[in-house]
Amino acid sequence: KGKGFWSWASKATSWLTGPQQPGSPLLKKHR
């Protein structure tokens, strides 16, 4: 059920963080 959300989340995260830092604070916050 959350597959679509995760695919969108990963896309949004990579878009938000950009190529600057792959391990952005957003990901750390989410975990």
UniProtKB/Swiss-Prot annotation:
An annotated GO BP: defense response to bacterium
One cellular component (GO) term of this entry: extracellular region
Major location category of this protein: secreted
Role of this protein: Inhibits a wide spectrum of lactic acid bacteria.
UniProt-annotated location(s): Secreted
Annotated protein name in UniProt: Bacteriocin leucocin-B
Residue ranges the record marks as coiled coil: none
The keyword Transport appears for this protein: no
Keyword annotations of the record: Antibiotic, Antimicrobial, Bacteriocin, Secreted
Organism, as annotated: Leuconostoc mesenteroides
Keyword Coiled coil attributed: no
